[in-house]
């Protein structure tokens, strides 16, 4: 088979995956609405373990598919956090920290600011994201990490933010990190 033909097949598979992903996001929206009604949390590690268990095996195909499913679930949670934020369902502690950072950026003469997030990831991913997941999600959304420090079990991540519009575009991501960390603090440095 010629490379062009193979690429056409790949494009067809990608198109089908896009349709399924869109369907998955719609389901995620329904899940978010149900969780809002029951005041449940977005991140449910036990549910994610159930999903992974559906795809056992050590063959390369199964391992790669579990990674794919893991990323899809991470993106679904990110989508759900956006729905929670859009409905005003935000933890007061996060909102206080976020508004403080927003005000500090507004007070500066420059639009370029560094935001430091100190957090404790969940090393066992029992109640939150691991450090690997956190770094992955920061990279996935184009967050410019300028400093990364470890101190015991805590991680300090400094990111560059170009004004309050850029900060607002990262709000959902920061909220996801807040909700899926053992501890969390955000400030301008």
Positions of the model-derived regions?
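Domain-level signature for soluble enzymes in the chorismate/prephenate branch of the shikimate pathway
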Residues: 1-189
């Amino acid at each position: 088979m010629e490379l062009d033909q193979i690429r056409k097949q790949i494009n067809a598979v990608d198109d089908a995956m896009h349709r399924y992903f869109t369907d998955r996001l719609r389901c995620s929206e329904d899940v978010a609405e149900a969780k809002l009604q029951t005041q449940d949390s977005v991140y449910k590690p036990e549910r994610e373990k159930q999903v992974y268990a559906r795809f056992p095996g050590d063959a390369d195909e199964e391992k790669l598919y579990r990674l794919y499913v893991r990323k899809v679930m991470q993106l679904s949670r990110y989508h759900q956090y956006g729905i929670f934020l859009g409905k005003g369902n935000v933890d007061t502690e996060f909102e206080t920290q976020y508004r403080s950072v927003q005000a500090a950026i507004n007070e500066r003469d420059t639009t370029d600011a560094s935001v430091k997030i100190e957090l404790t990831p969940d090393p066992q991913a029992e109640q939150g994201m691991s450090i690997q997941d956190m770094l992955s999600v920061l990279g996935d959304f184009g967050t410019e990490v300028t400093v990364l420090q470890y101190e015991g079990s805590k991680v300090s991540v400094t990111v560059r933010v170009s004004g309050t519009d850029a900060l607002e575009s990262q709000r959902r991501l920061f909220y996801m990190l807040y909700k899926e960390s053992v501890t969390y603090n955000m400030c301008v440095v």
